[in-house]
């Protein structure tokens, strides 16, 4: 199968974050819905994992993803719209000016800082829903990176948070990792 080979290639990139590997594996699938014959712009909207906090610029997720996609034959520019410490509320506040007319697809990797801060899952859901709606209004394919809550906030919080990503992916017809 091609997928294990893709995952092995992603692991060799040296960026050991689960979401980065899954994003890279799914990004080519995300771009498959867009005409690959012309230059494409893919925006990665996220937090420090997207931004590349603490890494040399060339070693971050976005430059590694762009290099990987280009090696696979995609004429793509991946725009780093990651902000260290960002929450879903921050992503929601930035989404309209992030999705410029030249954007062809979007990766959304937000929610980790919401978890760290114990933000109500209903607020995180509403923010992610607004981000996906903004992308949908522009007809953009989206890859939503799912997160799972640890159990330290209790079972009700965990259940509410864990349901956000699959529910919103189904509602908006997005790809989900």
Regions found by a protein language model. Name each.
Residues 27-29, 42-44, 83, 127, ...:
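Residues at the start of alpha-helices and the adjacent loop-to-helix junctions
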Residues 16-33:
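Bacterial N-terminal signal peptides
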Residues 22, 46, 112-113:
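Residue-level micro-sites within transmembrane alpha helices that shape
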Residues 1-18:
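N-terminal secretory signal peptides that target proteins for export/translocation
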Residues 64, 71-74, 90-177:
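Alpha-helical cap/lid subdomain in secreted, periplasmic
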Residues 1-3, 33, 176-177:
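Short intrinsically disordered, low-complexity coil segments enriched in acidic
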Residues 85-89:
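Acidic-and-aromatic substrate-binding clefts and catalytic sites of carbohydrate-active enzymes
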Residues 36-84, 94-102:
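Serine-esterase "nucleophile elbow" of acetyl-processing enzymes
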